[in-house]
């Protein structure tokens, strides 16, 4: 509601749609007073039931615009491209308003400029009269046009000017515009005559400090991160965005599904009431009139979760009268040009590969990204890219919507002493029976990235699955790789890319190179490229090569991607094995898929002395292995009567706080529909007593029916743990948990990284050698849950700098690991406290010891926090059979404190 100088001007509804007020008759010369009242709730609120914070206030820009009394009040640009996509025409419909009462004559001019400001064409029309009128200026026979696409977002400038009878310019403005065609043929969508896959995300206006008043810097941060992650489509769920964001999407290159501010959510039958027709039409019409000049807008969406009523039939007709773009509405396919669904399973997608409701199939929401999520994304896109009628989809959603606790923020407090953000969720506000129908608990936090826009393991997976380049058929002997260009328009050329490679030996970088010049690979084609790799490969180590397509400053008029990515940024990549033991007929396996698990060679101790003792009897019995290594450092390992390791020291320093035992603790948001039991202990027993044989010693311990561990002790202090798990029920994880002593903070690992990854979310995480700290391995979700897994572990090195001791772990067989200072038992309970409580990371106690998991397998993440798949069968922990890995521990003095990062 608006007043000027105390006089009422007008009122508007729709919190996320622009409103204009003519205040000409209310202003006076000099200072004026503008007053605004924002109603938090009104009847329009029933059409704004989106999954978001419902906050009060003005959260977008307010402008004051002055015009002549006779002025161009609207302009509508349309164009068409010929089949060659480089020639066509443009029409600009101008609406002229005359507020002067008397007749006037004006010259209207439209000028088309290219990116460099060169005039391409111009045209004029004359307005004469005193009534509102429309005039159309046509620019025909345009040639040598540069078409717009998300891959190459070339923008022209359309300048509109108005001159008086004497030729003096009275007003002028410009609009950025791109030439592109949108066509539907069969059950596919084409941009400029090319089939396009819409690789998208749903978005919200959210900022952890400013709430819904998102600033330009954050908008640009979001969009550049999306581009870097190969996202090409944005659904403005579930309301139009600020105009500035559309300008950014035009310039950076995105396909946009522009969605009206209409969502009934819990009250979807509202739309069946014809009394809402005018309100629905108003919201959709205002969106279309504002945004129809943006080339990035490909689809109009009539709203979300508002039922199937005929209200949207009328809204569709209104939209078609204003613009001819394709229309989407998931609630009723008869009002939509697209078939659409939310949260299908992979099998559902597979069964609709030729289309949905006999229309192009667009999955408007899928892969619900709440918490530790985005499992089996690859399987979705295997189906989509192998289809004849699926055009893509949008992940729900881009960013977690939590904000800083307002009570702490006003005191300048954003982080706890342990470095966790003071983020809150719907659970922190007046819930009823654990459910808040205004803020829906944690259902505002479904983001791929965190509220402060931190890159996550989820986003790494999206980047990999969404990438437009496929590397395959790597020949380890010839050092050649097949590169398939899956872009719709963009050639892979040395004009704008370089092909880089990095060779690693057991995770350490041994060779780094690039190709600056290579044969151009046009969109839709493939070529084989040979890399000048010089590294000699043998069977003494694992050799891997990372191949990357890197962005560089363009030449010869190529599209400039350095506007959103730094030079050298890898926009697409793959990893292959160079090792002979992983090679068959010269063709190496890519590490995107099934890996060869490492094999530990037999071990011979390089010196040292070992002794074993058994003391006490019955429940007081202890088993001790002690000795000195080849450097004269003493070690001791003690087991209690049941075989539980109770002490392990090296050079007088404690290595453990608790010995290994079976541990099945695992809980993430996607597990809410998965029922399992948790345990971190078993009924252990010594089945084969501690015995020395030659220079070595052995002991066998049974952990009830869960597992058996065969220990082998070597004189130099090395310990092998060969663990065989016996699975008899479906669990969330199968593995051992243990606690390392305080001080083992520095971490080096040779596994998939650098960010967390899981069995069904690891294609975007490559094998490498990474350094970090235990504290930095936390995935800071809004609510605590299992985190930090790293698949395909080869080696782990923990360093206690203060004590000057280091503990190395090498792996034989399949294994993953995670490390933490936090006890998972705090959120992995038999109840539902993880989801129905105010538990935050900053509420948890950081313990000094290091909680470690060594898993044979952890259940895949799936995407079942809302619809979708709980976990595909390939990633479910087996419920029967025996499974083995070996962990080889070796303590030593901490001489390798400064560890290479590659």
Model-based region annotation:
Residues 3-33, 37-51, 130-149, 213:
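Beta-strand-rich ligand-recognition modules
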Residues 94, 99, 384-638, 721:
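Carbohydrate-binding surfaces of carbohydrate-active enzymes
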Residues 28-31, 93-183, 546-551, 562, ...:
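Extended acidic/polar, glycine-enriched regions
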Residues 1-5, 34-36, 106-109, 490-492, ...:
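Aromatic-lined ligand-binding clefts that engage carbohydrates, nucleic acids, or primary amines
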Residues 7, 12, 19, 43-46, ...:
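Extended substrate-binding grooves/exosites of carbohydrate-active enzymes
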Residues 40, 149, 532-540, 555, ...:
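Beta-strand/loop-rich accessory regions of lumenal/periplasmic or secreted enzymes
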Residues 15, 23-90, 98-100, 173-179, ...:
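An acidic-aromatic loop/edge-strand motif
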Residues 29, 87, 128-134, 518-526, ...:
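Solvent-exposed, conformationally flexible loop/turn segments
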């Amino acid at each position: 509601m608006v007043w000027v100088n105390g006089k009422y001007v007008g009122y508007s509804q729709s919190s996320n749609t622009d409103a204009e007020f003519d205040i000409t008759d209310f202003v006076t010369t000099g200072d004026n007073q503008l007053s605004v009242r924002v109603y938090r709730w009104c009847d329009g609120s029933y059409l704004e039931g989106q999954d978001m914070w419902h906050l009060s206030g003005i959260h977008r820009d307010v402008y004051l615009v002055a015009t002549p009394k006779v002025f161009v009040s609207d302009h509508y640009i349309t164009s068409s491209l010929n089949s060659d996509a480089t020639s066509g025409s443009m029409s600009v419909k101008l609406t002229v308003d005359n507020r002067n009462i008397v007749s006037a004559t004006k010259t209207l001019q439209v000028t088309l400029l290219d990116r460099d400001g060169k005039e391409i064409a111009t045209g004029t029309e004359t307005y004469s009269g005193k009534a509102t009128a429309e005039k159309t200026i046509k620019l025909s026979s345009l040639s040598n046009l540069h078409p717009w696409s998300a891959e190459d977002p070339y923008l022209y400038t359309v300048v509109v000017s108005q001159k008086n009878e004497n030729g003096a310019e009275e007003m002028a403005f410009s609009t950025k515009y791109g030439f592109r065609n949108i066509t539907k043929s069969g059950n596919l969508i084409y941009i400029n005559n090319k089939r396009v896959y819409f690789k998208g995300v749903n978005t919200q206006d959210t900022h952890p400090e400013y709430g819904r008043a998102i600033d330009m810097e954050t908008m640009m941060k979001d969009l550049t991160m999306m581009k870097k992650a190969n996202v090409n489509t944005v659904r403005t769920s579930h309301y139009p965005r600020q105009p500035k964001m559309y300008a950014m999407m035009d310039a950076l290159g995105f396909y946009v599904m522009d969605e009206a501010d209409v969502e009934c959510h819990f009250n979807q039958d509202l739309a069946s009431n014809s009394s809402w027709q005018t309100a629905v039409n108003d919201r959709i019409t205002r969106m279309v009139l504002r945004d129809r000049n943006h080339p990035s807008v490909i689809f109009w969406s009539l709203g979300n979760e508002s039922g199937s009523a005929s209200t949207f039939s009328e809204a569709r007709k209104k939209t078609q009268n204003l613009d001819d773009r394709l229309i989407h509405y998931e609630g009723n396919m008869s009002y939509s040009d697209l078939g659409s669904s939310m949260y299908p399973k992979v099998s559902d997608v597979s069964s609709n590969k030729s289309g949905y409701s006999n229309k192009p199939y667009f999955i408007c929401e899928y892969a619900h990204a709440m918490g530790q999520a985005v499992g089996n994304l690859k399987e979705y896109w295997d189906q989509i890219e192998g289809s004849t009628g699926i055009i893509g989809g949008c992940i729900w959603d881009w960013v977690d919507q939590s904000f800083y606790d307002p009570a702490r923020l006003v005191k300048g407090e954003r982080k706890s002493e342990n470095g966790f953000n003071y983020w809150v969720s719907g659970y922190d506000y007046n819930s009823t029976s654990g459910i808040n129908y205004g803020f829906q608990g944690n259902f505002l936090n479904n983001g791929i990235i965190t509220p402060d826009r931190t890159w996550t393991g989820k986003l790494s997976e999206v980047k990999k699955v969404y990438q437009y380049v496929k590397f395959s058929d790597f020949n380890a002997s010839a050092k050649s790789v097949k590169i398939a260009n899956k872009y719709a328009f963009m050639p892979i050329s040395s004009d704008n890319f370089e092909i880089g490679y990095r060779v690693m030996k057991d995770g350490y970088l041994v060779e780094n190179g690039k190709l600056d010049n290579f044969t151009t690979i046009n969109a839709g084609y493939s070529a084989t490229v040979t890399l000048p790799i010089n590294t000699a490969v043998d069977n003494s180590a694992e050799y891997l090569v990372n191949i990357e397509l890197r962005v560089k400053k363009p030449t010869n008029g190529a599209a400039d991607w350095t506007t959103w990515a730094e030079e050298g940024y890898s926009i697409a990549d793959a990893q292959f094995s160079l090792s002979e033991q992983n090679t068959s007929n010269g063709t190496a396996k890519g590490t995107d898929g099934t890996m060869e698990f490492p094999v530990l060679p037999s071990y011979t101790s390089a010196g040292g002395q070992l002794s074993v003792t058994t003391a006490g009897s019955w429940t007081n019995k202890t088993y001790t292995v002690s000795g000195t290594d080849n450097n004269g450092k003493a070690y001791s390992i003690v087991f209690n009567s049941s075989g539980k390791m109770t002490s392990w020291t090296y050079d007088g320093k404690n290595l453990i706080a608790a010995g290994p035992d079976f541990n099945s603790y695992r809980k993430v948001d996607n597990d809410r529909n998965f029922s399992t039991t948790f345990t971190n202990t078993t009924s252990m027993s010594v089945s084969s007593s501690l015995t020395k044989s030659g220079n070595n010693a052995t002991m066998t311990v049974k952990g009830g029916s869960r597992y058996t561990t065969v220990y082998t002790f070597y004189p130099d202090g090395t310990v092998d743990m060969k663990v065989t798990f016996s699975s008899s029920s479906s669990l969330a994880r199968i593995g051992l948990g243990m606690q390392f002593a305080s001080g083992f903070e520095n971490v080096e690992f040779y596994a998939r990284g650098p960010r967390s990854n899981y069995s069904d979310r690891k294609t975007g995480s490559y094998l490498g050698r990474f350094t970090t700290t235990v504290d930095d391995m936390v995935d800071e979700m809004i609510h605590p849950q299992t985190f930090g897994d790293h698949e395909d572990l080869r080696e782990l090195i923990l360093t206690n700098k203060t004590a000057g001791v280091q503990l190395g772990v090498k792996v034989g067989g399949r294994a993953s690991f995670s490390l933490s200072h936090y006890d998972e038992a705090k959120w992995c309970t038999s109840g539902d406290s993880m989801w129905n409580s105010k538990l935050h990371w900053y509420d948890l106690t950081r313990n000094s010891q290091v909680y470690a998991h060594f898993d044979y397998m952890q259940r895949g993440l799936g995407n079942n926090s809302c619809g979708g798949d709980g976990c595909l069968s390939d990633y479910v922990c087996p419920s029967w059979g025996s499974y083995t890995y070996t962990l080889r521990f070796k303590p030593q003095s901490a001489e390798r404190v400064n560890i290479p990062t590659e």
